[in-house]
Curated annotation (Swiss-Prot):
It catalyses: RNA(n+1) + phosphate = RNA(n) + a ribonucleoside 5'-diphosphate. This is Polyribonucleotide nucleotidyltransferase. The gene is pnp. NCBIfam families: polynuc_phos, PRK11824.1. Its EC number is 2.7.7.8. The keyword Flavoprotein does not apply. Residues 632-700 form the S1 motif domain. One of its GO terms (biological process) is mRNA catabolic process. One of its GO terms (molecular function) is magnesium ion binding. The keyword 4Fe-4S does not apply. Keywords: Cytoplasm, Magnesium, Metal-binding, Nucleotidyltransferase, RNA-binding, Transferase. Belongs to the polyribonucleotide nucleotidyltransferase family.
Length: 712
């Protein structure tokens, strides 16, 4: 029997609707929804565990996967099955996770798993924001203690007009690409990139997004009404007992306050708080494992942590001071240096307080592009940034593994920040890779990576239009008091209510990422944070320009020199040769790297050399290969083979003609080897080129009839 499906069509902008369907598939999940926009469909499910996770954080897992079959494609490579998540899948999972996480209550420690499968991939709309709406609707139907709904939309701007959920073609033409998540009354997450837009334009984009978000949230409420309200999930909050927090505040609050107001460094701050926790455990427990009330050492430590949080937030709101002595708008001390690494193509150290990033540049050829094989796009990236956060940067002893979700997310954020100033390929035909290695971290290492990357690009001589800087903004909201913080420390990020990262040039914003720990952010606070970040960004740019004012005029001596030649596309095969034989031989002879490709009906040969002499040698060889022999012209060739009927003479690379025995001399030639040997240089005249490319040569014009010798 066909199950009954409940469908809600939501017109989020005039003449464009997103549909939500439940009850047809995946009914054993606690909540399941199929979200559809155009031909793109996403199955979103939400499942909750009955048991409590032993961790002391909310165990939320969000997965987003694009099935190649959804787009009528088969995965590339030897294994024809989807493997580990792609970067895009990881980034989309993070987008949804960051919107969901602040909407669950403190003390909820049951595992929550949200899964999104792209089951149909249309040609017009990407699936990422559709999955966000589906995830929210699935949670609404699951009975979870979820303070939703929320909705995600993409905002673009083409020719000055804002577009909600633009087509992929419109996104390509847009100067803004923002993903915005929010509830009916506030925004909870923002991420995206832009081409140096103003703070006012950013606010306009967010306003446009929020109008559609409200409609999508209202539609989710209607879907739940159709399907029936789910039974609420039964759970008990696992919070630090308020009586214990109050006791610790009375007994240790003054000590915590004194420590917070004292001299600051990351090590002394955390060490001192740790000592106070140890002291409290010893004082309260002694040799016992728990108190008569059942409080354990873990409970006592958590209670001191709550006291610390309260004291730090009160200090910020009431005194206008922060734990390191700065006021709300101060940027930490800066120092930076370029050219630190002698062998790389460009390098920079950027240090802000106790956060430090070493950036390095590698310039490569088109062989070094990053191929991207995805359901919605097959592209090649000629600019990419890799962020790495080794454990020693925070004083930890741990294992080095592959990139984690956070590292992939920070890599993309920094890459987006710099992308608008990267020159076009026709101006600077290099593949550019940035390594951003965190050396020390005490907050905002991704923004330090943007600054280090910008400095390193200029040190490498990459002709970027202007430098880019980044800053992380924070928020502390207590009752009616709201304080926006510039350049937040790690502890301010941990105990605060917002992490809002913004990057840009002097002329505007290039990228942003906002995460909330409370249920949302008002428009006025958002505008204040944007304007405050602009002042900080300009301050950092001033210091960066003191270090290096503009890109170096010359590339590093270790960087490849790229030269591009255009050739007839019909000659590409001649340059490459059978099995790559010809191009490999040219590379070996000239100590260069050569790539050959066709673009828009034109053959493009790119030569990478470390010096001008090698480049010129390779250029000459390529020109010889692609040159076309002309009838009536004279050539100096090399004898490649001898037969009874004549000799084969190579007059150009890979172009050999027949010098018939009758054309070697005016006299009768009985034995060709009496006149020519393999390897001899011989001057010939091209008599004829046949339709099949075969050439007929003669030596007679250069032979004296009297002595039978070739004239010089």
């Amino acid at each position: 029997m066909k199950p009954e499906a409940h469908i809600e069509d939501i017109e989020f902008v005039p003449d464009r609707s997103l549909s939500l369907e439940t009850g047809r598939i995946a009914k054993q999940a606690d909540g399941s929804v199929v979200a559809r926009l155009g031909d793109t469909m996403v199955l979103s499910t939400a499942t909750l565990s009955d048991s409590v996770n032993e961790s002391n954080f909310f165990p939320l897992t969000v997965d987003y996967r694009e099935k190649f079959a959804a787009g009528g494609k088969v995965p590339g490579g030897f294994i024809k099955r989807e493997g580990r998540p792609t970067d895009k899948e990881t980034l989309t999972s993070r987008l949804i996770d960051r919107a969901i996480r602040p909407l669950f209550p403190d003390g909820f420690y049951h595992d929550v798993h949200v899964v999104n499968f792209v089951i149909s991939a249309g040609q017009d709309f990407d699936a990422d924001v559709i999955a966000g709406v589906g995830s929210s609707a699935a949670l609404m139907l699951s009975g979870a203690p979820f303070a939703g709904p929320f909705a995600e939309v993409r905002v673009g701007r083409v020719d000055g007009d804002y577009i909600v959920n633009p087509t992929m073609q419109q996104t390509e033409e847009s100067d803004i690409d923002l993903v915005v998540a929010g509830k009916e009354d506030a925004l909870v997450m923002v991420e995206g990139e832009a081409e140096e837009i103003s703070e006012e334009s950013m606010i306009e984009a967010l306003d446009v997004a929020h109008r559609s978000i409200r409609r999508l949230c209202e539609g989710q409420h209607r879907l739940v009404e159709q399907a029936g309200e789910p039974d609420p999930f039964e759970w008990e909050a696992d919070r630090v007992p308020e009586q214990l927090v109050q006791r610790m505040r009375e007994e240790y609050g003054p000590k915590v306050a004194d420590h917070i107001h004292g001299p600051y460094s990351k090590e002394t701050f955390h060490g001192g708080i740790g000592d106070l926790k140890d002291q409290a455990v010893d004082d309260v427990l002694g040799d016992a494992s728990e108190t008569p009330e059942g409080y354990t050492a873990s409970d006592i430590r958590d209670a001191i942590g709550e006291v610390e949080k309260g004291e730090m937030r009160n200090m910020i709101v009431e005194e206008g001071k922060r734990i390191d002595g700065r006021d709300q708008t101060d940027v930490r001390d800066l120092w930076m240096e370029v050219g630190y690494l002698p062998r790389v193509h460009g390098s920079a150290i950027f240090t802000r307080g106790e956060t430090q990033v070493l950036g390095s540049i590698t310039l490569g050829t088109s062989d070094d592009v990053q191929p991207v094989d995805e359901v919605f796009a097959d592209t090649d990236k000629s600019f990419y940034l890799h962020y790495r956060f080794p454990p020693f940067s925070v004083g930890e002893a741990s294992y080095l593994r592959g990139p984690k979700r956070r590292e992939i997310g920070h890599s993309m954020l920094a890459e987006r920040a710099l992308r608008p100033v990267i020159p076009e390929q026709d101006e600077f035909p290099y593949t550019i890779r940035i390594n951003a290695d965190v050396m020390e971290s005490n907050g905002s290492s991704s923004m330090a990576s943007v600054c280090a990357g910008s400095l390193a690009l200029m040190d490498a001589g990459v002709p970027i239009e202007k430098p880019v800087a980044g800053i992380a903004m924070g928020l502390v909201q207590e009752d009616d008091e709201t304080t926006v913080l510039t350049d937040i420390l790690g502890q301010e990020d941990h105990l605060g209510d917002m992490d809002f990262k913004l990057t840009g040039t002097r002329d505007g914003i290039t990228a942003c990422q906002m995460d909330m720990k409370i249920e949302g952010l008002s428009r006025d606070v958002m505008l204040k944070a944007l304007k405050q970040s602009r002042d900080a960004r300009h301050h950092i740019l001033d210091r960066m320009e003191e270090t290096i004012a503009e890109p170096r005029a010359e590339l590093s001596s270790h960087a490849p020199r790229l030269t591009k030649l255009t050739i007839d596309p019909d000659r590409i095969g001649a340059v490459i040769g059978p099995g790559g034989k010809v191009v490999k031989s040219v590379q070996e002879e000239t100590n260069t790297e050569i790539t050959v490709e066709e673009e828009e009906g034109v053959g493009i040969v790119t030569i990478a050399a470390t010096n001008q002499r090698d480049a010129e040698a390779a250029i000459e060889r390529i020109k010889q290969i692609v040159a076309v022999p002309e009838e009536g012209e004279d050539y100096v060739g090399t004898v490649k083979g001898i037969r009874d009927f004549g000799a084969f003479v190579e007059i150009m690379p890979e172009k050999t003609g027949l010098l018939h025995v009758s054309e070697i001399d005016y006299d009768y030639v009985e034995n060709v080897e009496d006149y020519l040997e393999v390897g001899d240089k011989v001057k010939v005249h091209l008599l004829e080129v046949h339709d099949d490319g075969k050439m007929r040569l003669t030596r007679k014009p250069f032979v004296s009839e009297e002595n039978g010798e070739q004239n010089e």
